[in-house]
C-alpha cells in the first residue's frame, strides 16, 4: 500500500471544516512491526493514555496483528490492522489504530484507539484522523481481491454517556457532529468479551463489558435505521476479530448474545451518539 494520504473526499459529512487544517504540517507513518524503530515510541504514548485503564492490547497482540496478510483469510475474512503515528518535525502529534475486516460484501473497520496531543486538538486534525481508516478498508479489499467499491462501515465501541466523564462526553459530541450514529442500545445490547487475564477469568465468571456501537456507514450517513441482519453481520465481524486472540470458551458468552438480536428484516434506529 502506498503511504497514507490526506484525502478530503473521505471526510465524514460533519468533518468538512477539517479541510482548513493544513496537512503539510504533519506526516503519517504506518508502523509495520514490533521491530519498527518507531513502535516503542508510539506504543508508549498510547500506553500512557489507555494502558492504566486496561484499554490497550499487549505488545505481543499488536505484533501479531501487524503481521496479518489481508490476502490470507482469517475466519473467512480478510483482516488488516494499521497502527499509525502522526508527527510534526519529529515530535508526537497523534496516533491511531484500527482493523479492517472484509469479505466480498464489504468492509467493517473497527476503530480502536485515537490519541491527539492536546496542542493539536480543536484545529481540524481529528477530522482527518477519522477519515484515514477508509484507506485501510480499501487496501484490505484490494489485497483480498474484493470489489474496490464495496460498502464500508466504520465502527467504534464507546462507553455510554454519564454526564460525569467530561472527556467521554466531548468525544461523543465530536463523533455526533462528524455524522456518526449510534445503534439503538434499547434494541441491541452489545458487549465486549472479558479483557482480563486468563487466570482472572478462570478464577471467576466472564465479565462482559457493555458498550454502544457508534457507526459511520460511508455514503449512507443520512440513513435513520439499519436492519437487524445488518447489525448482526457487523457485530459478528467484531467478534471474529476478537476471536483471533480470545479463547473459544471466553467468546461463548458474547456469541450467545446474538440470539437475542432483532430479526433480520427488523428496523433498528440509528440515533445521535449523545442520545
Predicted regions located by residue number:
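Alpha-helix termini
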Residues: 69-77, 102, 135-149
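Conserved acetyl-CoA-binding loop-helix of GNAT-fold acetyltransferases
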Residues: 116, 122-144
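Hydrophobic, Leu/Ile/Phe/Ala-enriched alpha-helical segments that form helix-helix packing faces
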Residues: 42-51, 133-141, 178-179, 242
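A conserved beta-strand-loop-helix scaffold within acyl/acetyltransferase catalytic domains
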Residues: 33, 43-118
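Short, well-structured alpha-helical interface segments that form or flank functional binding sites
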Residues: 106-109, 124, 128, 132, ...
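A generic structural motif
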Residues: 102, 115-120, 162, 220-222
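Terminal substrate-recognition subdomain of acyl/acetyltransferases
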Residues: 1-36, 49, 145-275
Amino acid at each position: 500500500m502506498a503511504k497514507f494520504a490526506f484525502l478530503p473526499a473521505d471526510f465524514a459529512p460533519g468533518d468538512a471544516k477539517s479541510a482548513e487544517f493544513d496537512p503539510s504540517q504533519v506526516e503519517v507513518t504506518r508502523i509495520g512491526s514490533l521491530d519498527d524503530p518507531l513502535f516503542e515510541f508510539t506504543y508508549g504514548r498510547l500506553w500512557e493514555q489507555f494502558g492504566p485503564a486496561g484499554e490497550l492490547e499487549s505488545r505481543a497482540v499488536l505484533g501479531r496483528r501487524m503481521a496479518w496478510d489481508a490476502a490470507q483469510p482469517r475466519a473467512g475474512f480478510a483482516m488488516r490492522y494499521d497502527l499509525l503515528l502522526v508527527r510534526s518535525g519529529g515530535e508526537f502529534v497523534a496516533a491511531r489504530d484500527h482493523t479492517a475486516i472484509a469479505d466480498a460484501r464489504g468492509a467493517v473497520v473497527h476503530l480502536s484507539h485515537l490519541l491527539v496531543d492536546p496542542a493539536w486538538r480543536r484545529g481540524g486534525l481529528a477530522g482527518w484522523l477519522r477519515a484515514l481508516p477508509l484507506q485501510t478498508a480499501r487496501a484490505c479489499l484490494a489485497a483480498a481481491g474484493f470489489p474496490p467499491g464495496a460498502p464500508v462501515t466504520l465502527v467504534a465501541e464507546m462507553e455510554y454517556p454519564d454526564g460525569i466523564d467530561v472527556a467521554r462526553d466531548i468525544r461523543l459530541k465530536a463523533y455526533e457532529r462528524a455524522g456518526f450514529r449510534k445503534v439503538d442500545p434499547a434494541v441491541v445490547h452489545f458487549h465486549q468479551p472479558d479483557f482480563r487475564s486468563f487466570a482472572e477469568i478462570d478464577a471467576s465468571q466472564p465479565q462482559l463489558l457493555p458498550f454502544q456501537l457508534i457507526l459511520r456507514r460511508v455514503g449512507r450517513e443520512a440513513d435513520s435505521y439499519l436492519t437487524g441482519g445488518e447489525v448482526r453481520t457487523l457485530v459478528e465481524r467484531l467478534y471474529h476479530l476478537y476471536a483471533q486472540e480470545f479463547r473459544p470458551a471466553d467468546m461463548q458468552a458474547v456469541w450467545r448474545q446474538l440470539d437475542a438480536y432483532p430479526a433480520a428484516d427488523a428496523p433498528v434506529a440509528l440515533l445521535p451518539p449523545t442520545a
